Swiss-Prot record:
Part of the 50S ribosomal subunit. Forms a cluster with proteins L14 and L19. It holds the Pfam family Ribosomal_L3. GO terms for biological process: translation. Belongs to the universal ribosomal protein uL3 family. The keyword Ribosomal protein applies. PROSITE patterns: RIBOSOMAL_L3. GO terms for cellular component: cytosolic large ribosomal subunit. GO terms for molecular function: rRNA binding; structural constituent of ribosome. This is Large ribosomal subunit protein uL3. Keywords: Ribonucleoprotein, Ribosomal protein, RNA-binding, rRNA-binding. It comes from the Bacteria.
Length: 236
């Protein structure tokens, strides 16, 4: 079964390996997620599964439209705050999943597996070029104007082309971007607490919503190397 889970970022900590190395890890509350709908190529044009995460009280159901509530009632599941559709190329990747099935962290992932984590970065507001684009800034001597050393400086050329090029790095809004961190490693799994320990940092603030999925680039490359080694072995 190839699918992912919606998760909530709890925070960061560190663990020690048997060799004594200190590894920074991010603690994620991954799932449990419930299958809300199963899409098929025959009926919908593609194979996918829709999962829900974070149960909402019935008293807040009026905030959803009737078609949205109808999807949950048809599946016989609670109303969820977050819903995610996961497409696959082959229906075999989803196995026999159907509406109402519960996906837990130990069913989807395993230790030392490579994963991709997608989320929204922290919002920094309106920032200057030094913070937003890591520019060097001007010389910091006493002859410059007030805070001139943090200004962007010249942004154009001469009479030709006589304009500012599109994409020029300028001050502006920084953060709140969709970012995917690829090829992180699952360090540990606590199935009873639905906890997933991931090596390194992931985007977003604490309590932020994340989507954890099998790595798009990690596993196939390893498999490819194994096939190359098998073909390179001398035939007896």
């Amino acid at each position: 079964m190839s699918t992912g889970l919606l998760a909530k970022k709890v925070g960061m900590t560190q663990i020690f390996t048997p060799e004594g190395d200190c590894v920074p890890v991010t603690v994620l509350e991954a799932g449990p997620c419930t299958v809300v709908r199963r899409k098929t190529a025959e009926k919908d044009g593609y194979d996918a599964v829709v999962i829900g995460f974070g149960v909402v009280d019935e008293k807040h159901a009026h905030r959803l439209s009737k078609p949205e509530v109808g999807v949950f009632k048809k599946a016989g599941t609670p109303i969820f705050r977050h819903v995610k559709e996961i497409r696959v190329k082959d229906a075999k990747q989803l196995g026999d999943l159907k509406a109402g099935d519960v996906l837990t962290v130990d069913k989807v992932f395993k230790a030392n597996q490579r994963i991709d984590v997608a989320g929204v970065t922290k919002g920094r507001g309106f920032t200057g070029v030094m913070k937003r684009w890591n520019m060097k800034g001007a010389a910091r001597d006493s002859s410059t104007a007030h805070e001139h050393h943090r200004h962007v400086g010249a942004i154009g050329q001469r009479k030709t082309p006589g304009k500012v090029w599109k994409g020029k790095h300028l001050p502006g809004h920084y953060g709140v971007d969709n970012v995917t961190i690829q090829n992180l490693t699952v360090v540990g799994i606590e199935a009873e607490q639905n906890v997933l320990l991931v090596s390194g940092a992931v985007p977003g603030h604490a309590d932020g919503l994340l989507f954890v999925n099998t790595a798009a680039k990690g596993q196939p490359r390893i498999k490819q190397k194994q096939e190359v080694r098998e073909r390179a072995k001398p035939k007896v």
